[in-house]
Amino acid sequence: MTFMDFEKLRHGTELIKRGFARMQKGGVIMDVTTPEQARIAEEAGAVAVMALQAVPADIRKAGGVARMADPEIVQQIIETVTIPVMAKARIGHFVEAEILEALGVDMVDESEVLTPADPFYHIDKTQFTVPFVCGARNLGEALRRINEGAAMIRTKGEAGTGDVSQAVKHMKQIQGEIRALAGKTKEELIMVAREIEAPIELVVETAKMQRLPVVNFAAGGVATPADAALMMRLGADGVFVGSGIFKAENPEKMAKAVVEAVNNYDNPVKLAEISKGVGAGMKGISADMIPAQEALQERGW
C-alpha cells in the first residue's frame, strides 16, 4: 500500500490549491485576532478563520503600518480550532507569506488591508505550495492575480467600513465584464486582454466558462446577515466577514446569523427570522466619506 503524504495532498499543485479554495464554497470566513474569537467563529459555523493583528476597522482607526499578525497568535489559533486557518500578508511581502506557510496556515491572503510592502509587484504565488486569496475590483485585477497563482479571488470592497456598497460594486463590475466577453471572436478577446492587461489564455477561459476560473468570494463591508445574503444573491461563491462580527453588539449572535443567512440566502422568510434579535451591527462609516488616498481598495495594481 502506497503511503500518502497528506501535506502534499493539502497543498502543492495549482489543481490542489484551487480544489482547497472550492471546498470553502457556500461558506463564511471570519476575521479573528485571538484564539477565543476563532473558537466563537468555529462554533458559529464558519468554514475557516482569517488570523490578523487587528480587524480592518481598528487598522483603519489606528493608522500607521499594518503588518502580518504575530506568528505566536497565528500558531495559537491553528491549535485552537479544527477548521482551516488563513492569515494575511502584505502585498508583495513574500517573506511574510513564507513565514505563514512555515507556520502551517491553510491559505494566505495577500491583502490590501495591510500596508503594501512592494510598490511594483505582487507576490509570485506560483512559488508557494500554500494557496493564496487576493482581492480584485475588476476583471483585469482578478485575472492578473490568478495569473500570479491566486487560487481564490474576493471583492476588495472597502474593508473596515461596514458599508457593503463597494463590495456590491466590485462584484457587479467583475460579472458585467465577464458577460461582455460572451460571443466575442478570438481577435476581439485579444483586444480585451490588452485593454485589461491580462493574459489572453485566461480571458479566453473566462469567456468560455462565463465566470472566473477560480472561486470568487465577497468581502469588504459585509456587516449584517442581510449583507451576506445580498452578496450571495449577486453571485458570490461565499463571504468573508471582517469587522462586521466582532465589532457588532453581540458577536456570537451576529456570527451565527451571518452563517445561517449565507445558508438561506434565497429565502426571505428565513432571513427575516435569522435577522431578529441579533443586536446592532457595527457602527461603520460610509465608504463615500473616505478620501481616495485613504481607501484600502486602491492598494494593489
UniProtKB/Swiss-Prot annotation:
The keyword Lyase applies. InterPro entries: Aldolase_TIM, PdxS/SNZ, PdxS/SNZ_N, RibuloseP-bd_barrel. The keyword Amino-acid biosynthesis does not apply. It catalyses: aldehydo-D-ribose 5-phosphate + D-glyceraldehyde 3-phosphate + L-glutamine = pyridoxal 5'-phosphate + L-glutamate + phosphate + 3 H2O + H(+). One of its GO terms (molecular function) is amine-lyase activity. D-ribose 5-phosphate binds at residues 31, 160, 221, 242-243. The active site is at 88 (schiff-base intermediate with d-ribose 5-phosphate). Keywords: Lyase, Pyridoxal phosphate, Schiff base. Pfam families: SOR_SNZ (PF01680). One of its GO terms (biological process) is amino acid metabolic process. CDD domains: pdxS. Pathway: Cofactor biosynthesis; pyridoxal 5'-phosphate biosynthesis. Its EC number is 4.3.3.6. It is an enzyme of class 4 (lyase). D-glyceraldehyde 3-phosphate binds at residue 172. HAMAP family: PdxS (MF_01824). Catalyzes the formation of pyridoxal 5'-phosphate from ribose 5-phosphate (RBP), glyceraldehyde 3-phosphate (G3P) and ammonia. The ammonia is provided by the PdxT subunit. Can also use ribulose 5-phosphate and dihydroxyacetone phosphate as substrates, resulting from enzyme-catalyzed isomerization of RBP and G3P, respectively. Belongs to the PdxS/SNZ family. In the presence of PdxT, forms a dodecamer of heterodimers. This is Pyridoxal 5'-phosphate synthase subunit PdxS.
